[in-house]
Each structure stands twice: as structure tokens, then as C-alpha cells.
Curated annotation (Swiss-Prot):
The keyword Cell membrane does not apply. This is Protein rliB. PbH1 repeats lie at residues 522-544, 545-567, 621-642. It is found in: Secreted. The keyword Secreted applies. Residues 266-392 form the G8 domain. SMART domains: G8 (SM01225). The lineage of its organism: Eukaryota, Amoebozoa, Evosea, Eumycetozoa, Dictyostelia. Keywords: Glycoprotein, Repeat, Secreted, Signal. InterPro entries: CEMIP_beta-hel_dom, G8_domain, G8_domain-comF-like. Glycans are attached at N136, N195, N279, N318, N547, N605, N728, N845, N1030, N1044, N1091, N1107.
């Protein structure tokens, strides 16, 4: 009993001591404040003078096994010990005489002529019998794309080294070799080939490895001599202000004299400080200050409500709060614009996955919600710049990097270096490292850098700070269900200098890390220099909110679209100087056909089906200011989906989001994306998102959809309202198709594109100007077997002008079979007979650097393809093809050679090159009953005749085939003779689709003697057939050719008609004009009707005069 009483007494004394300490450290006096945290950074050690040697270690989880004879079994290689990276390889009986140990991840980048070491410990599991020995091993580095073929066909390694050693012991023996590669190896896969003296017999055996590693040698630390100071050669990428936000510590909110302490019982109506397990409501009309000693920093607070007349203000002192829910109807203050906090404040959100709204109705659970009329202000210490770029290239094993911009980062903080690899999601080479020391723009890390990160003059990997002093995070259990915390603001909110990690709730709408939700037009809200890491669902969301600013933020390792404009009504927001990196699709990434894409439907595992194509910036309404942002990775870096109507909460709003053009898109960068779909791009204007009218669920298709951008976002057929989506000063690199635009109108002015399949794929009325397009530079990129082109001209009904562009480094690919497999500047799209090019492409002021003449144009000859036969463009100054005069470029057929003195055939390009002179390129369509039916689709080999040049001194046959698919393109102001194998028709229509002002087609058609004609024209969509006429008989073919198109003539062999379009006046509105080049419009529709009758000769039952002879009209016409 006495012992029990003593224990009680000791507990009581301890309780009094605790109370006394709390009273001393957390007074209730209204003037008392805890000491504010210091803004001082930890002292940095000096940078070293020597970079230590570093090891890249390979354990069992980093490797897999390959062998011949269908003996490849991943289970053959198993980890034994993580401590020493020990692994075993079980070799079954009858195993082949060698096998391969293959690294799962890319090898370190290796510098030429540097001595590296490869080492390991090796032992046998059993003594080998029957004279079998491990004779030698070969260390090799292969192109990653070759690995899958090694067992079936020869692939030359990029480097290999065979060595011998003691491989016969059942106890570990160490082996070290020194090797040096003759050329830089940026991207490769390490393979160790283990060779036996002969194949195994009937015994199962085991071998063991441990401590396998590549050692990068030590080296002196010397600052590179030519650090990058300008991140682009041609364009201007704007940057955030170099200065820190101004501070006035006299305004700090914790200094206000009317504050009451949370820990003071008198603050509360019942004179009791609330306990964590209670639902806590801040007293009405009070401004309550939380200090570290005010609350338990380990217990979990259930729910805190801040009423409309109340405020909850945090002291600037180190604090941890564990909480489930916070509802802000009044004000939540943790620093302000002029008083950024320096404390380490950690808010940890707790709660299991649920659909119950525990914060408040519609606000979900496990987070902070700010209702309409509420206000939240969270401001941590400003670290600036929040992200920058490398100032020099970083190699595997380096520990020090140099960056371009001034930074005030601190020792112990974490830093991201983004990938310099194309396929970001497949081969993750993003690296997160910890700062060991820092001096100016030089940063030393605690561990060596594993991968190569490019920092050349063309482009540079981004370097971002991932640490902040204020952290909002989900609890450790959040990983189990991808159900983290979330911050939702329906009022006004100001966030700066905070980190949000393990936030967002996967596939739960409106539960994102940081989210402005139906806040309408905000007046003083922003998100600045924050960072989101390891997000389960998005990063920063703007939903039903206008006039919000997101600037200088970072996001890394994010599931689903990251910077996310949700419903399509979000306008007049500003996204500036933000970085998104390593963004993941939800589920398998979207793929599908080249233009059709794939369709996804809303379901519980994909509540926003567009997340199948998740990217860094998702812009459902383009009318926003988007400046100086960068997107690394993702399905696309920037996505502009097409929405005919808003979705979600705004599905009944009368608006067409897709009709809005870009308000400002200036100085943005995207890389390492677009590769997951054949038509994918790093900046993607395409895809379609709708609400199914029957089910009410979202449906997303990734593919080609029109985007009719017009004034004020109001769709119209009136061309005076047309607006072009404009992309200024844009950079893409390590991309598939760079900037992809399926829409109706686009201008890309100021573009740098490097190491990409193509810089852009532009549809509609498109202008690409003031650009550098560089085929290859980064050694990671050089090691890939990509077939790159400077631009591919489309095959029908678009208009594309390329002006003021420098193309560089398109190096011949010796393995290419066809021109369009090669690295060439201009590539033709030649696969179809249904889709044939009119005059739709032009170039002007083109510069070529380090490009052989053979690599300038690639045109694949496809006999059954009209898009091959009619490929053409006009080089308005001859700068691309080297003629230095306006030049018509036409396909391989002599049909394009209108004059021997002005046309030459280029065998490398398989095209004709002709001086333009007064000629142009035009297009007409013949519509013939029972033969060529408008809109009908037929096979490419459905040949029905030909069209041939005549007159102007032409005596030989210069023709091209025509098929049952309508459409012929050729050089205008020349003679064209139509020949149909089945005879000439009693009736046909000729649509003068593209016969420009002052141009014509002198048409000849053979008919039997005695044929008479009635010929008229129809301006189909004009009032009372304006400009239509009836043709009259001329006295000669020459008179027809010199006429205004109202004459025809029949010489008893050929009918002659001059095809013109009298509607045209030469107005600039009749063509697409940009950069000094033009493309004539297609006119819908001016049609010639030709009726033929013959009293002496009867047509066949299909209406054709047969038994005609193929004879060209006179060459003197």
C-alpha cells in the first residue's frame, strides 16, 4: 500500500512539474508571444576541391536473366542479401553455354577515355563437374532498343570488354577490371555475358554474385569554363522577377494586440481548453493564436471549425499539428504576403478512405476546406528561384552541379534534377538529391548523381527545390489507398512557400492537393512558390474560378493531370513560371490509331477519363495567360482538350470552351513526352471531352477533333471572326511530335525544337515561323535509332506555311529503307489515294545547317497513292531547294515538268523542281456519273485514266494516273488533257476547287467527230448564280486559251475549255498569307457542267463515247 501511495505521489509531483513548465513556457498573458523562428539558413560547408569516387551498385532487384533455348526465366535470378547486393542465379540442367545478366535501368553515362572500374565478388554454389568451367565474362553496353533482339539476331554493342578470372571457387573471389569507352555513351544498357566452356549437362547448378558495381573515378572539382547564361539561342523564355517578395515584419499577424491564446481557458466559453478528441469551434468574434505549446503535437485533432467572424492565427514557431478536418468560414492565417513565416510547421492530415463529408457537406474529408466568404493565408519562407536550369551538363558520378540563376536554397534540402531522357515514364532518370553544401550557383549533394543530365546551349534540365519549411501532408497510411489530405478553397486564398506531399485522393473529384473550387472571380488569391510531391491526384486545380494566379510553383511525381483547369469555364487566370515533372497517367496510357486515338469512359477507377492522357498542364479553356512554364514528362506536357460544352458543375452553362483561342501562351517549354501514342506531342491541342447525355458520365477520346477558334469564343462561319491559336517563343525537346495541333487555325511563332521526331504537327490554317529545328545534339538522344524529320506536310485540305526556319543536323540514317524512314528536313505524307493534296504547303526563308543535299526532302513513291502522285509545295524564294527563285516542287511523275528549260528531276528526293515564274499549283475535281462519284471512297488502284500536259512545246507524254477517287493537282496556266480508259462521258462536272485569280487550266477532252456541247457554270452557293455563265463557241483552241473562260472549242478531236474562277479578285482574303508566302484558298464551289451529244455516235449504256484514240493536242497551243 505504501509503495502504491508513493507512486501516486510521484505522478502528482510530475503533473505539477509539467503544469509549471507549461505555465512558464506558454503564458496566458495577452502580450506574450513565442520567439519567432529565424530566417537564417544553416551554415554550408565549403565546396570540396576533389569529387570522391562513386559507385553504381547492382543488386538482384536491379538485374534480370536472359538465355537461349527458351531458358529465359526471371525467377532464375534472385536477391539473397540487400546489404551486400548479393544475388544468386539458378541454372537448370541443359542450360546453354552462356547467359546474360541485364540491368533493368540505364547504365551510367560514360565519358570517353575515362578509366572506370567494374567489380564484383563471385562464387560457385557447387563444384562443377564434367570439365565445365566458367571460362570468361564480357561486359557490354548496348542500345536499349536492341536488348529484346539479342537472343535472336546480332546486335553490335556500343562497347564490350571480355575478361578472365578465378571463377572456379565455392568461396567468394573478387574481380575488378578497368575499362575505358572510346566515345561518350549517354544512354545504354549494361549486360554481363557469362560464358561457360560448354553447355551444361544434367546437373542443376547455382552461382552467386555480390558487390557488383561500376566505380566512377574521383576527379578535381573545377568549375566548367563556359557555363550557360542564356537558356535559348533564338527565342526568349521569360523568367520570374529576380527579387524576393518585400517583407514588413511589423505587420506580422501574430503581433496583433487583440489576439487571445488557444491555450488560455478564458478563450473558450466553458473556460476549458478543448481536447483533441473533441469537435472544436473557435469562439465567435475571436482571433485565436496557436503557439507550439498551445496544443498536443502528437494527438490527432478531430475537427476544427473557424466561424465567419473568427480567425485562427498561427505563431511563427516550429509546430506539428495532427488533424483530420478543418473548416474555414472565417480566416485561417499562417503568415501573410508581407510576413512570411520562417518556422518549420507541419500539418498532418489523418483519416481513412471514405466518401462521407466529414469536413462539411460537399467538402469531403481529411483536409482543409475554405467556404465562400472564408479566407486562408499560408506563407512560408521564400526560396527563390523555386526552380532553375543546369548551367552545364552533369555526368554519372558527379556530385556538384552548376545552375543558371541565383538561389537561396539550404543545406539539407532536397533538389530535383529532371530527366534528359525521351521516355520519361519508361526509363525514369529524374533524380532527387540532398544538398550537402552550396556556394552561389554551385550545389554539392550528399550522394553522387546517377544519370546524365544535359545542360548544353540547346536546352538544359530543370533543377527544382522540393523542400519548404511549411508542410501540409497526408499521414503515413495515405499510401495504402492513395488517399491523402486535400485543401479546397471556395473563398479567397493566398498560398506561398508551402510543400504539399502525399496529398490528393485518387479518383475522388474535388479532392486535390491545392484546389480553388467554384470560387468564381477571385480578387486577391494566388498560389506562389509552393511544391507538390508524391501526389495521389493532381497538383494545383482551378475549378470554376477566374482571375487566379499560379506562379513559381513546382510539382513532381504526380498522378493524373497536374495543373488542372477543370470544367472549361475557367478564364483570365495566370499560370506563370511553374514546373511540372514526372506526371503519370491513371491506368494504362492512351494510345490507339494515328488519328482516331482511343476512347475512355468515366468509371470508379478513372473518374476523369482524360487522365488516361495525363500531363503537366491541362487547359480546358485556352483563354488564360500561360507564361514561362515548363513541363517535363507526362503523356503530354500541355494539353488543350476540345470541349463543345463545359462539364461537371458547369455542364449547363452556355459556352463553347473549344472556341476560345489562347489569351497568352508565351515562353513555355515541354520535353520528354508525347511518346506513348504515335500522334502524341508535348504540347497537344486535340482530344475531345464530353458528357454523355444518356448516362451523364464523362467520355474522352484522345484523337483528332476540330477546334474552331473564333472571336469571343462564339463559333461562326464568318471568316471575319476567325482567330488563330497563338504559341509564342516555345521550346520542345526530346519529344515525339513537339507541338501537335488538330485545330482549324494556329500560329507558332518563335520555336526551338531539339532531339524530337518532329517539331510540330499542325493542321488547319497553320503558320510556323522564326524557328530552329535541330535533329540531334544530346548524347542520350544520339544513341536512339529515331527517324527524325523537320516537318511533314499533310495530304489534304489544310494550309501550311513554314517561314524563317533554320534546320540543323539531319544526319542520314544508313538503315532507312524509305525516305520517310530517314532523318530528313521535309517529309511527304504519301499513304492514301482518298486524301490527296491540293496546293496546301509553302516555304520561305529557310536555312540549312549541317545537312547533306540528299536529306532535304523525303518523298516515298507509292504507285497506288494520289497523295504520292500529287505531293507538292511552293518554295517562294528557293531557299529550301537551293534555286534561290520562287520554285514549284512536285512529285516523282513527269506530270509536274511543264517546261524542260525550267524543270529538273532530283533523284535523291524523287521529285521535280521547277521555276515558278507566272505559274502556280491548282486543283480540280472531275465528277463523272457511273465512274467518279463525289465523296465516294475507292481503292487506290481503281485507275480509270490519266491527265496529261499538252501545249507549250510539249511533244512527249507527261501524265499522271487518275482513279475513281476524285481530285487532280498540278501546275496551272498549262494544258491538261483528260483521258478516261472507258471513253469520254456524255456529262461531267468540273469543280474549279483551286484555280487562283489570273490562273487557269486549259482543259482538253477527246470526243468523236460531230459531237456538240452545252457548257455552263454554276456558282453553287451564290445568290442567283452570281458569276455563272453559259459558254459560247469560239473559232479556235487558241481563242479559248486567250479568253476569260466563257469560250469553248471542238476541233473534231478534242473539246477545249478554259477552267477559271471568275468570282475571284485577287484579294488577300482569297489566300492564306504569312511571312511573305501564300497559299490559295479552295473555293466552295464553282462548277463547270459539260454536256455532250453526238447525232452520229451513240454512247454506251453507261453514257460514255468509246473507241477514241489517245492523242495529245498540238504542242503549239
Amino acid at each position: 500500500m505504501k509503495n502504491i501511495n508513493n507512486k501516486i505521489l510521484k505522478i502528482f509531483i510530475l503533473f505539477l512539474a509539467i503544469c509549471s513548465v507549461k505555465s512558464d513556457t506558454c503564458p496566458t498573458d495577452s502580450n506574450w508571444r513565442p520567439t519567432p523562428a529565424s530566417s537564417n539558413s544553416p551554415v554550408s560547408p565549403a565546396l570540396p576541391t576533389t569529387s570522391l569516387a562513386s559507385d553504381i551498385v547492382y543488386g538482384g532487384n536491379d538485374l534480370y536473366y536472359m538465355a537461349y533455348w527458351s531458358m529465359t526465366d526471371p525467377n532464375n535470378l534472385q536477391p539473397v542479401s540487400d546489404v551486400e547486393s548479393e544475388f544468386s542465379i539458378a541454372l537448370p540442367a541443359w542450360a546453354p553455354d552462356y547467359f546474360l545478366i541485364v540491368a533493368k535501368q540505364s547504365a551510367p553515362a560514360l565519358k570517353a577515355n575515362t578509366n572506370y572500374q567494374f567489380s564484383f565478388d563471385f562464387k560457385l554454389g557447387q563444384v562443377l563437374t564434367q570439365g565445365i568451367t566458367y571460362s570468361n565474362m564480357t561486359l557490354s553496353f548496348y542500345k536499349p532498343g536492341d536488348i529484346d533482339y539479342l537472343l535472336w539476331s546480332y546486335r553490335a554493342p556500343m562497347y564490350s570488354f571480355t575478361f578472365t578470372g578465378d571463377f572456379s571457387s565455392t568461396t567468394y573471389k573478387s574481380k575488378t577490371i578497368t575499362f575505358s569507352v572510346p566515345v561518350d555513351l549517354g544512354l545504354s544498357t549494361l549486360i554481363l555475358q557469362v560464358n561457360r566452356s560448354r553447355a551444361m549437362d544434367y546437373d542443376d547448378t547455382t552461382i552467386f554474385y555480390k558487390n557488383m558495381k561500376i566505380t566512377v573515378p574521383s576527379k578535381p572539382v573545377v568549375a566548367p569554363p563556359n557555363l550557360i547564361t542564356k537558356d535559348s539561342e533564338l527565342i526568349n523564355i521569360p523568367k520570374a522577377s529576380v527579387s524576393l517578395d518585400p517583407q514588413d515584419l511589423s505587420t506580422c499577424p501574430y503581433l496583433a494586440s487583440d489576439l487571445v491564446h488557444w491555450h488560455n481557458p478564458s478563450t473558450w466559453s466553458n473556460n476549458l481548453v478543448p481536447q483533441p478528441n473533441e469537435n472544436i469551434t473557435i469562439p465567435a468574434g475571436k482571433r485565436v493564436l496557436i503557439s507550439p505549446c498551445s496544443i498536443s503535437q502528437t494527438a490527432i485533432y478531430q475537427r476544427i471549425v473557424i466561424p465567419a467572424t473568427s480567425e485562427l492565427i498561427f505563431a511563427d514557431s516550429n509546430l506539428t499539428m495532427n488533424v483530420k478536418d478543418i473548416l474555414v468560414q472565417g480566416k485561417f492565417i499562417m503568415g501573410t504576403t508581407k510576413c512570411r513565416y520562417n518556422a518549420n510547421i507541419n500539418i498532418i492530415f489523418h483519416g481513412s478512405k471514405t466518401k462521407v463529408d466529414t469536413i462539411a457537406p460537399f467538402y469531403g474529408s481529411k483536409g482543409i476546406a475554405v467556404s465562400a466568404g472564408g479566407f486562408i493565408s499560408v506563407h512560408g519562407k521564400q526560396y527563390h528561384n523555386s526552380w532553375t536550369k543546369l548551367a552545364s551538363t552533369v555526368w554519372s558520378g558527379d556530385r556538384i552541379i552548376y545552375v543558371q540563376d541565383n538561389i537561396n536554397w539550404e543545406v539539407g534540402q532536397q533538389v530535383l534534377i529532371t530527366t534528359s531522357q525521351f521516355k520519361d515514364e519508361i526509363d525514369n532518370q529524374n533524380e532527387v538529391l540532398t544538398i550537402k553544401s552550396i556556394l552561389g550557383k554551385a550545389i554539392e549533394f550528399t550522394t553522387p548523381i546517377k544519370f546524365y543530365h544535359y545542360g548544353g546551349k540547346e536546352y538544359q534540365a530543370e533543377v527544382a527545390l522540393l523542400s519548404r519549411r511549411i508542410i501540409f501532408q497526408g499521414n503515413d497510411e495515405s499510401d495504402q489507398d492513395s488517399f491523402g489530405g486535400h485543401v479546397l478553397v471556395s473563398g479567397e486564398g493566398q498560398f506561398a512557400g508551402i510543400q504539399l506531399k502525399k496529398m490528393g485522393q485518387r479518383n475522388v473529384k474535388a479532392r486535390y492537393p491545392l484546389h480553388f473550387h467554384l470560387a468564381n472571380v477571385v480578387q486577391k488569391s494566388y498560389i506562389s512558390d509552393c511544391v507538390v510531391t508524391k501526389s495521389y491526384y493532381r497538383c494545383y486545380t482551378i475549378h470554376g474560378t477566374n482571375n487566379l494566379t499560379l506562379t513559381r510553383n513546382v510539382a513532381f511525381d504526380v498522378n493524373g493531370h497536374c495543373y488542372y483547369l477543370e470544367d472549361g469555364v475557367e478564364m483570365d487566370n495566370t499560370l506563370s513560371y511553374n514546373l511540372a515533372a514526372f506526371v503519370h497517367t491513371i491506368g494504362e496510357p492512351a494510345a490507339g490509331g494515328a488519328q482516331t486515338g482511343e476512347t475512355y469512359y468515366e468509371n470508379e477507377n478513372l473518374t476523369q477519363p482524360a487522365d488516361s492522357a495525363a500531363g503537366g498542364f491541362y487547359i480546358t479553356n485556352a483563354y488564360n495567360t500561360i507564361i514561362g512554364n515548363s513541363a517535363s514528362g507526362g503523356w503530354a506536357g500541355f494539353s488543350f482538350p476540345n470541349l463543345e460544352k463545359p462539364i461537371g458543375n458547369h455542364k449547363n452553362v452556355e459556352m463553347e470552351p473549344q472556341a476560345f483561342t489562347t489569351k497568352v501562351f508565351e515562353g513555355n517549354t515541354a520535353h520528354s513526352s508525347g511518346y506513348q501514342w504515335i500522334s502524341g506531342s508535348s504540347i497537344y491541342v486535340g482530344g475531345k471531352l464530353i458528357t454523355d447525355e444518356v448516362t451523364g458520365l464523362l467520355v474522352y477520346n484522345t484523337g483528332r477533333h476540330s477546334r474552331p477558334t473564333c472571336k469571343d469564343g462564339i463559333f461562326s462561319y464568318d471568316s471575319s471572326t476567325y482567330l488563330w491559336m497563338r504559341f509564342n517563343n516555345t521550346k520542345v525537346y526530346l519529344s515525339n511530335l513537339g507541338l501537335g495541333h488538330w485545330g482549324d487555325r494556329v500560329e507558332v511563332v518563335g520555336l526551338e525544337a531539339y532531339d524530337s521526331m518532329r517539331p510540330a504537327s499542325l493542321f488547319g490554317a497553320a503558320w510556323l515561323s522564326n524557328a530552329i529545328v535541330d535533329g540531334t545534339g544530346n548524347i542520350l538522344s544520339k544513341s536512339q535509332s529515331y527517324n527524325r524529320q523537320g516537318f511533314q506536310f499533310y495530304d489534304t485540305y489544310v494550309t501550311t506555311i513554314l517561314s524563317h526556319i533554320t534546320f540543323r543536323n539531319f544526319i542520314q540514317n544508313p538503315t532507312s529503307v524509305y525516305p520517310d524512314d530517314d532523318n530528313v528536313v521535309i517529309i511527304a505524307l504519301t499513304f492514301s489515294d482518298l486524301y490527296k493534296p491540293q496546293f496546301i504547303s509553302s516555304t520561305i526563308n529557310i536555312t540549312l545547317e549541317n545537312i547533306l543535299p540528299a536529306q532535304i526532302i523525303g518523298h516515298k513513291i507509292v504507285p497506288d497513292s494520289g497523295s504520292s502522285r500529287f505531293f507538292n509545295f511552293i518554295d517562294w524564294d528557293g531557299s529550301l531547294v537551293g534555286t534561290h527563285v520562287p520554285t514549284i516542287v512536285g512529285s516523282h511523275e513527269k506530270w509536274w515538268s511543264y517546261d524542260d528549260s525550267k524543270c529538273t528531276y532530283n533523284n535523291d528526293w524523287t521529285i521535280w523542281v521547277c521555276q515558278k515564274g507566272s505559274k502556280s499549283v491548282g486543283n480540280i475535281e472531275f465528277w463523272v456519273p457511273n465512274l467518279i462519284i463525289r465523296g465516294e471512297q475507292n481503292e487506290g488502284d481503281s485507275f480509270v485514266g490519266s491527265v496529261s500536259l499538252f501545249g507549250d512545246g510539249i511533244t512527249d507524254v507527261r501524265k499522271t494516273a487518275i482513279t475513281r477517287n476524285a481530285g487532280i493537282t498540278g501546275i496551272t496556266s498549262t494544258g491538261w488533257m483528260l483521258w478516261l480508259d472507258g471513253g469520254s462521258p456524255t456529262y461531267l462536272q468540273v469543280w474549279a476547287a483551286q484555280v487562283a485569280y489570273q490562273q487557269y487550266i486549259f482543259l482538253a477532252i477527246p470526243y468523236p467527230p460531230g459531237t456538240t456541247f452545252t457548257i455552263s457554270t454554276e456558282n453553287k452557293w451564290a445568290w442567283q448564280n452570281a458569276y455563272g455563265f453559259n459558254c459560247t463557241l469560239a473559232s479556235s483552241a487558241a481563242e479559248v486559251r486567250s479568253s476569260n473562260g466563257t469560250k469553248y472549242y471542238f476541233d473534231q478531236t478534242h473539246l477545249f475549255v478554259k477552267i477559271v474562277n471568275p468570282v475571284l479578285t485577287g484579294s488577300p482574303a482569297e489566300s492564306f498569307n504569312r511571312g511573305g508566302a501564300k497559299i490559295d484558298d479552295v473555293y466552295w464551289e464553282y462548277i463547270y457542267h459539260i454536256n455532250a451529244t453526238n447525232p452520229n455516235v451513240s454512247p454506251n449504256q453507261d453514257g460514255f463515247y468509246t473507241n477514241l484514240s489517245y492523242t495529245l493536242p498540238s504542242s503549239t497551243l
